[in-house]
C-alpha cells in the first residue's frame, strides 16, 4: 500500500492549550500527509494542498536536527513506519497525523495507525473534520483528536455552515469511539462573535473548544476575550481554552 506523503519529523506539539484531548507541550512524531480538499485563507502548508504536485517527501534524519533526506512519492507504508521508528526518542507521547488532510488517504492512514498501535504508540489525529464518513473508519484507531471548526473568515469552502455541521458530526463520532477530542477554532479580526456563539452552542456538552488566533496575531485582546467569554458562557468555564502556535516561537517545526 502506498501513500502520498509530505514529511515526517520529531517535535513538540505546539497547539491545543490545556483542554482535554490536547497534547500541548508533548513530544510527538509528526506524519504529514499531502493533499487537502479545502483552501483556508491562513493555510501554512499550502505547498502540500495539491497532492498530485508533491513529487517527493522528506523525513528527518535525526531528531531535532532539522536535517532531512528526500524520497520520491508515493511512499510505501513501511517506508513511513521506518522513518517514524528512526525518530523514536523514547519519550514520544503519540504519533500525530496531520496534513493537508490525512483522512483523504484513509486506507494508508488506517494501515499506519494500526501499525503504530502494534508498536505501542498512541494515535493523535489532526483533521479538518469535514469528512465524517471517513472519520468513522479511523475513529476506532484514534486515541486523541484535534478537529477544526472552520470559521467563516477561513473562506475554506462556499458551504461554510455545512462544513461546520460536518465537523461537529466528526467530533461526535470520535467521542463515541472513545477518542479524547477537542475542537480548534482559528479566529481572525474578521471573526464574528455571533458565529463563535453558534459554534459553542453546537459543541456544548460534546467536546471542549480552544480558540486560536491566526498567526501573526491580528485580533485584539479585547476581541479575543469577548470570544472566550461568550464561548465559556455557553459551554461552561472549564470547557474553553486558548491555543497559540508555540512551536513557532521555539523556532521548531
Curated annotation (Swiss-Prot):
Coiled coil: none annotated. Its cofactor is [4Fe-4S] cluster; S-adenosyl-L-methionine; Mg(2+). Disruption phenotype: Temperature sensitive growth at 85 but not 93 degrees Celsius. Its EC number is 4.3.99.3. Mg(2+) binds at residue 45. It comes from the Archaea. Signal peptide: none annotated. Binds 1 [4Fe-4S] cluster. The cluster is coordinated with 3 cysteines and an exchangeable S-adenosyl-L-methionine. [4Fe-4S] cluster binds at residues 36, 40, 43. Gene3D superfamilies: Aldolase class I. Substrate binds at residues 12-14, 32, 98. Pathway: Purine metabolism; 7-cyano-7-deazaguanine biosynthesis. InterPro entries: 7-CO-7-deazaguanine_synth-like, Aldolase_TIM, Organic_radical-activating, rSAM. Keywords: 4Fe-4S, Iron, Iron-sulfur, Lyase, Magnesium, Metal-binding, S-adenosyl-L-methionine. Homodimer. PANTHER family: PYRUVATE FORMATE-LYASE 1-ACTIVATING ENZYME, PYRUVATE FORMATE-LYASE-ACTIVATING ENZYME. This is 7-carboxy-7-deazaguanine synthase. It comes from Thermococcus kodakarensis (strain ATCC BAA-918 / JCM 12380 / KOD1).
Amino acid at each position: 500500500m502506498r501513500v502520498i506523503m509530505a514529511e515526517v519529523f520529531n517535535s513538540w506539539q505546539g497547539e491545543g492549550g490545556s483542554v482535554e484531548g490536547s497534547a500541548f507541550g508533548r513530544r510527538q512524531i509528526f506524519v504529514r500527509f499531502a493533499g487537502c480538499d479545502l483552501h483556508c485563507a491562513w493555510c501554512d502548508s499550502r505547498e502540500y494542498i495539491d497532492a498530485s504536485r508533491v513529487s517527493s517527501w522528506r523525513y528527518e534524519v535525526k531528531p531535532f536536527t532539522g536535517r532531512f533526506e528526500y524520497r520520491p512519492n508515493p511512499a510505501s507504508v513501511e517506508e513511513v513506519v521506518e522513518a517514524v521508528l528512526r525518530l523514536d526518542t523514547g519519550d514520544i507521547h503519540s504519533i500525530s497525523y496531520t496534513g493537508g488532510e490525512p483522512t483523504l488517504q484513509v486506507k494508508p492512514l488506517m494501515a499506519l495507525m494500526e501499525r503504530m498501535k502494534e508498536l505501542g504508540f498512541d494515535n493523535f489525529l489532526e483533521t479538518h473534520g469535514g469528512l465524517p464518513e471517513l472519520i468513522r473508519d479511523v475513529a476506532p484507531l484514534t486515541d486523541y483528536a484535534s478537529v477544526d471548526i472552520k470559521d467563516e473568515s477561513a473562506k475554506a469552502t462556499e458551504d461554510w455552515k455545512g462544513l461546520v455541521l460536518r465537523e461537529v458530526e466528526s467530533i461526535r463520532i470520535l467521542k463515541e469511539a472513545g477518542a479524547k477530542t477537542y475542537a480548534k477554532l482559528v479566529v481572525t479580526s474578521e471573526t464574528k462573535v455571533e458565529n463563535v456563539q453558534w459554534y459553542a452552542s453546537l459543541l456544548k456538552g460534546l467536546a471542549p473548544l480552544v480558540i486560536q488566533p491566526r498567526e501573526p496575531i491580528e485580533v485584539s485582546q479585547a476581541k479575543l476575550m469577548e470570544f472566550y467569554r461568550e464561548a465559556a458562557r455557553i459551554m461552561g468555564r472549564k470547557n474553553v481554552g486558548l491555543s497559540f502556535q508555540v512551536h513557532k516561537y521555539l523556532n521548531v517545526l
